[in-house]
Amino acid sequence: MIRRGTYLNTADNSGAKKVQCIGIPKKVNFGKQTDFATLGDVITVTVKDALPNGAAKKGKVYKAVVVRTAKEVSREDGSYIKFDDNAVVLLNNNLEPIGTRILGPVAREIRAKGFYRIVSLAPEVI
């Protein structure tokens, strides 16, 4: 679960290394509004640490999709999936990835949310 203020790793080669979540869209879950994001959700992030020659610059605000979470997520078949870290892929205004490579595995839930470009670039889909 990603909340406002959470620091996340980037799973692409956009130039950002660490980002911080600054905005989560409201969604209704069992009649209650949730204030957290999970796999496949688009959040607003700001870059906290970046490479000097990368496309993403420190202090800039981007949209990002959550591709890995440390908190376990239940799947429809009853199994659970969790990762070692929280990671995102930075997106442009058209919700396409800024980077040209995806580093590390991504969850299968990304495909269900319609981010086919990220799934095709990922080395492994779990």
UniProtKB/Swiss-Prot annotation:
Keyword rRNA-binding: yes
An individual GO BP term: translation
Record's keyword terms, sorted: Ribonucleoprotein, Ribosomal protein, RNA-binding, rRNA-binding
Gene Ontology cellular-component terms listed: cytosolic large ribosomal subunit
GO MF, one annotated term: large ribosomal subunit rRNA binding
The keyword rRNA-binding appears for this protein: yes
Pfam families: Ribosomal_L14
Superkingdom of origin organism: Bacteria
Gene3D superfamilies in the record: Ribosomal protein L14
Subunit details: Part of the 50S ribosomal subunit. Forms a cluster with proteins L3 and L19. In the 70S ribosome, L14 and L19 interact and together make contacts with the 16S rRNA in bridges B5 and B8.
HAMAP family, per database record: Ribosomal_uL14 (MF_01367)
Family, similarity comment: Belongs to the universal ribosomal protein uL14 family.
PANTHER family documented for this protein: 50S/60S RIBOSOMAL PROTEIN L14/L23, LARGE RIBOSOMAL SUBUNIT PROTEIN UL14M
Function: Binds to 23S rRNA. Forms part of two intersubunit bridges in the 70S ribosome.
Protein name: Large ribosomal subunit protein uL14
Taxonomic source organism: Persephonella marina (strain DSM 14350 / EX-H1)
Lineage: Bacteria, Pseudomonadati, Aquificota, Aquificia, Aquificales
